[in-house]
């Protein structure tokens, strides 16, 4: 229910005023739960008023996000009585020409970046007058890309600002070290040593190594510099890249982290979303959590994926956990979600911010916790610190027991009134 004179609605309307003043062209970087979708709704309502016969196109990266607009009962189009709106998943959109008054690109990070061809196609295939790009967070290369197209920042609003305003639940990001067992530690150490042996060829410079992977001419330049044959440099490129993939896959499937995610979820018994980088890991977690858990990943049919989301949202079922592999980082909202757990990750800040956003929707009395499980003294720890740079409310713990103590202490302080949770 939208309150027309609430501080949030007044702020959202001010964002639209800034957008119009900028020629009705620009992007907003607004955290999940603060109301970025309603800013899109306001832009559509303005277009409906000024151009009642003109079409509006919304481009989204996934069916989940499309459903948020088109659902016959709870979609934004239905709830707000929007007219002349058509919603497209981006892969379908770029297959044909389009003509509209307003083009909205939701989760624009999927169509922007130094190497992105998708944004070019969306723009080139669309004749439009107004452009609004929505996202919760962008990395620097996305911003540079958009600025190059003359798409400027209209408004930035962070999760901490949302908490301070009382629009999001207070939260903590708790980083918990999970050790490798003896056999896995030996395996990782050998793998990492082999990686570094070949990395030395490129002066331990990731950019040089990746340039050699993608640019054959640069390999020749480096071979001349080192006094090597091209065959030898090609072998180093192959072995470095191969060992990087092996190390990554190993860290994506660490059994001790998967088992820790299961134990923590069972112990805390909060409504929980679990994130990882492998379907096998997501499957194992779902199986261990039993009937209380559903899955969501790319190997499922669209029908089954939608059904599983419905089971989690429906308070009448026993389902309270969802295990996801490279999915649900965006476009999935459930105010009751209180706990997030990441058991494998990449180094990208974008993914970490989006996953955190899944648990921050405001719910009375809720404090949200996001648990980051990592293997200390490995590349996984470096990925963790990279992904959490500039993140607020981050605590590095020593053990799972310390995690339990923090949450129990918070509960006690809420009950005795020491912590004021709205």
What is the role of each PLM region?
Residues 1-29:
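Conserved pre-motif I regulatory segment
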Residues 23-43, 275:
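Walker A/P-loop
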Residues 63-99:
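Inter-Walker segment of RecA-like/P-loop motor cores
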Residues 67, 273-275, 280-329, 351:
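Conserved helicase ATPase core of P-loop NTP-dependent helicases/translocases
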Residues 100-104, 323-324, 330-346, 351-352, ...:
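A short beta-strand element within the Helicase C-terminal
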Residues 113-171:
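Post-DEXD/H (motif II) to motif III coupling segment of the RecA-like Helicase ATP-binding lobe
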Residues 183, 187-196, 245-288:
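Conserved interdomain hinge at the start of the Helicase C-terminal
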Residues 358-387:
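Conserved segment of the helicase C-terminal RecA-like domain
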């Amino acid at each position: 229910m939208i309150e027309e004179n609430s501080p949030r609605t007044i702020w959202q309307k001010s964002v639209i005023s800034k957008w119009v003043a900028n020629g009705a062209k620009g992007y907003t970087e607004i955290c999940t739960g603060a109301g970025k979708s309603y800013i899109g709704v306001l832009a559509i309502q303005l277009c409906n008023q000024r151009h009642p016969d003109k079409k509006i196109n919304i481009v989204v990266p996934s069916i989940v996000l499309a459903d948020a607009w088109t659902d016959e009962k709870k979609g934004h189009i239905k709830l707000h009585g929007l007219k002349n709106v058509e919603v497209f998943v981006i892969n379908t959109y770029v297959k044909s020409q389009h003509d509209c008054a307003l083009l909205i690109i939701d989760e624009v990070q999927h169509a922007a970046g130094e190497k992105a061809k998708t944004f070019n196609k969306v723009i080139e295939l669309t004749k439009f007058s107004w452009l609004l790009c929505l996202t919760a967070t962008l990395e620097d290369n996305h911003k540079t890309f958009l600025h190059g197209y003359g798409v400027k920042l209209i408004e930035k609003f962070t999760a901490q600002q949302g908490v301070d305003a009382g629009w999001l639940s207070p939260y903590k990001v708790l980083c918990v070290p999970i050790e490798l067992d003896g056999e896995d530690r030996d395996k990782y150490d050998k793998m990492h040593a082999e990686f570094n042996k070949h990395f030395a060829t490129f002066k331990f410079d990731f950019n040089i190594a990746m340039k050699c992977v993608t640019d054959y001419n640069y390999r020749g330049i480096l071979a001349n510099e080192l006094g090597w044959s091209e065959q030898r440099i090609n072998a180093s490129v192959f072995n470095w890249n191969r060992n990087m993939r092996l190390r990554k896959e190993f860290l994506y499937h660490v059994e001790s982290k998967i088992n820790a995610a299961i134990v923590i979820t069972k112990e805390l018994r909060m409504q929980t979303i679990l994130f990882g980088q492998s379907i096998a890991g997501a499957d194992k977690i779902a199986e261990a959590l039993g009937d209380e858990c559903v899955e969501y990943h790319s190997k499922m049919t669209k029908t089954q994926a939608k059904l599983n989301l419905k089971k989690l949202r429906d308070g009448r079922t026993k389902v309270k956990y969802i295990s996801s592999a490279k999915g649900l980082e965006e476009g999935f909202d459930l105010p009751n979600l209180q706990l997030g757990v990441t058991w494998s990750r990449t180094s990208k800040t974008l993914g970490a911010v989006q996953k955190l956003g899944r648990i921050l929707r405001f719910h009375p009395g809720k404090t949200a916790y996001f648990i980051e499980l990592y293997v200390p003294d490995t590349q996984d720890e470096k990925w963790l610190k990279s992904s959490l740079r500039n993140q607020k409310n981050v605590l590095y713990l020593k053990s799972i027991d310390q995690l339990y103590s923090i949450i129990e202490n918070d509960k006690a302080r809420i009950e005795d009134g020491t912590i004021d949770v709205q």
